[in-house]
Amino acid sequence: MGDYHEFTDQYKVPVIAKLLHALPHYNITFHKINSTFRPNDEIYLESLGILGSVPAALLIVSLLGLLFYLMTRCCDRKPRPAHSITSLKVALSIVTVMCCAAIGLGLYGNDDLHNGLLEVLTAGRKVDNLVTTIRNQTHILENTLTNRIRPQLVELADIFDQPVSNQTALSKLFVSLNIVQGNVTLATNAASDIRRPLMGISMTHFLTRGDQWELIRWPGTVATLALLLVLCAVLLVGVARHSRCALILFSVCGLLAVTGSWLMSGLYLSSSVAVGDLCISPADFLVSTAPRDLPTNVLLHYTQCEPGHTNPFTQRLRESQNSLNNARSAMATVMKISLVLFKSSGLQPKLGAVNADLNSSERLLTQLTALVDCKAVHHNFLAAARGLCEGGLLGLVLMLIASFIAAILLTIMVWVDSHTWIYIRKRNDYAQVDEPSYISHPAPQNHQQMMNAARTLPRNHNGHFSPPVISGSHTLQHPSKRQQHEMMAHAHIQQNMRAMGTHTLGRLPSHNHSPTHMTGPNNAAAVAAAANAAANMPPTTQAAQQQQQQQAQQQQQQAQQQLGGPQPIYCHHPHQHPHPHPHQHPHSHSAAAVAAAVQHQHAIYHQQQAQQYGTYTTAAHHAPHHLGPGQSQIYQQIPAHLAPQLAANGNPHSIYQPLVAVSQGSIYVSNMATMRRQNSQGGPQIPAHQHPPSLHQQQQQPPPPSQQQQQLHQLKSPQQHQQQLQQHQQQQQQQHHQQQHHQQQHQQQQQQHHQQQQPNESDVVPISTAMDTAIYDRDKQIYKCSTLRQGGKFDPKYKPSILNCPLPEIPKDAEQPKVESIYEQRQQAHHQNYSKTLQRPPMMLPPQMKAIPPPRIGTPTSPPPPVAQPLNESNGGVPSGLQNGGAVVGGGGANANEDTSLPPPPLEAQTEATKARMGAGPAANGKVLHNGGGGGSVGGGGGGAVDDDDDLPPPPPAITDESNYAVTEL
């Protein structure tokens, strides 16, 4: 069994070692040399260096290739178009994963090499310990035989020199003592022979250095491969996150990784070939490195340990053992004879010590015989050889393959990475810009621009009015593509808000204006001029003009009714008299003339708009109705084909597009401000269809307080203001009686015509204050949110209740108004070609000329006026009208398709004749009609005169009240 184990437990050369050993070994002159492992031979080391230079050559080639590629990229200054780097990123990711796998393989090979080297070192330590033990045992045996037994034998010989009677026994005693001494010498020589060759064997230095190198190599290799893994991870992160910085970092560090990988490949290749050469015949390497004192046969015996070979130390051990046995036998004879011959000498202890030393020496020889056996040394040799040539060499080869593959992959990765990051644009830094202002327009530079901005609303490209600008909250967003903005939770509140009108910047809740009502300094000047002209005109002329104007209006209304219904879209009404007592004005005829001229301009504009837009019906009331000759239309007129849609779906416009609706070139304007102001000032109520108006209610409502004096105080120079104020106070008492007379006459005529047109009257429905209160609260909240209301700064205390309101631009600079006289406009109106075709309104720039106060109107939410029953046949059946700025307002008629058209331009003679008739006509019914200082006078005349040079432009296509555009003073 032992022979079989000895036979099967032999070293076999691994296949990897054979392959590596088969590699050609060339010197510097490219001559093939012996491939035997000779680490101390320079030629052999030269051949290993040449083999290791192959990866170094590949390193140089790869670096040159990368260098040329980078040079071409650096020299290429052409702008690169947008290029898809998805394929490059995918390829780079795949190569990176493969490189990580190669690095992992290198880590596995490093662990195998580490384990193989540990086995070699462990086996070497065991062999070294065994040799040391044999050497120590032989040394102890030799010391015992030489230093302890031999001196005792010498002492015994001295004792035996004493004379004795039995010479024969004495001679036999000396012979046995000499045999003991001789055998001890033989045993000592045998032990010395065993120890002598082992004295030069010492692997302690080799093992210690091996431990040190392995302690550095293994963690160093792990750290290097881990660093490569980190670089691969950086590359993967850069590819995943499209990071230009990470890719550039890998490009720089990748060059170092490529260099290190190729250098490690060369080192591993040389080491692998060397270990392969060693593993072909490790015993021969041991023989070549064995000390000179160690015989070759001894080393080969221990490395091969063949059963047929004799142990070189066994013979000497056997000789030593035989010598000790002979010495012990002889010592026994000596003890027997000496004890008989020398009884009184005390030899017993000495003889016992010699026997004890001989026995210990024999035991040492027995142990030494077991130590010098080749089985233990051969086992350790096989363990070391297998650990190095099988596990260690395999791990080294794996590291060689891993480093070679990693070097190639890293070279590819660096090239692809360098080709990839040039197509990744650097991320643009965020520009340091100021936060945009939430006010969509800059503040006016001076007071004039502020006033122009306050009087003018922006228009869009179609000439229609754009929504107002409401600033003061940063939550207000710019208009989106949506056509409608649902701002309120309830439909009725939203409808009330839509009926309200637009707001200007910084307006108080009560300052609701229509887009076209541009009252301001220009209007104040026009009012003052009209007052002066009225004061200079005779009463007869004014009465004649007023009478002629009323007749012309009646004729025009009848012609309009015969042609097909109401014509104008925009109805301008005379303003209320600015003074509470019209009877104080004596020169009412002059004011009436001026008012007739102003009303003539409105008539021209109504005719133009009527011929462009045609006849429309009222969306709110479809029942046909008629208007009296002195009445005006206060409802919006909407095309008949859109009225059912609007009635069913409600107003499709948001609250920030109130009163402005464009459909097939038509503009529908509604205003809620007039009703609210009339209600707050105690003005007239809106008549309904089914409630007859009360005469007492009509007469007890006073006109609104005067605003003429306030405008004169604010906008006129001090001298002009004082003169104008004195004239105004002198004329108040004279004009009041005449104006009252003309107003009664005008009211009788309107009631007669209204009784003919409308046989049925309705009761007066008081204006509801619920909707007015909601509108006022909404306006107040908007006013609180205004930035101008807070002194140009946003006040966080006020929470805006309206979101998503559009912020259109307001014209920054107002151009100078174009001067056109009223006579030029009259001439243009006469030469204009009228057309009954429905046309889109002309594109008009924002009004930049002096404006006149258009007439006060009603609101679209009030029902149409009823037809009053005949109160008195003696006065011609004049119905009780509604006082609305001095004119009887007919919010609706009996026929929706029949409307009174505006009168044609009056001639001067006709104007005077009309005013004469109006002055002579008695007030039969005794009703006083307040209309701004004269029956039918427009703009609250009576406080001044209108010059011919003053410009009175046509009003823009919208309906407004007399409220002023206000700019809150900061």
UniProtKB/Swiss-Prot annotation:
Single biological process term from Gene Ontology: chloride transport
Keyword terms of this UniProt record: Cell membrane, Chloride, Chloride channel, Glycoprotein, Ion channel, Ion transport, Membrane, Transmembrane, Transmembrane helix, Transport
Keyword Transport: yes
InterPro entries (alphabetical): Tweety
Gene ablation phenotype (knockout): Flies lacking tty are viable and fertile. Was named 'tweety' after the cartoon character that cannot fly. Indeed, a mutant involving a genomic region that contain tty leads to flies that cannot fly.
Extracellular domain ranges by topology: 1-47, 111-219, 268-395
Record function comment: Non-essential protein that probably acts as a chloride channel.
Protein name: Protein tweety
Species of origin: Drosophila melanogaster
Originating gene: tty
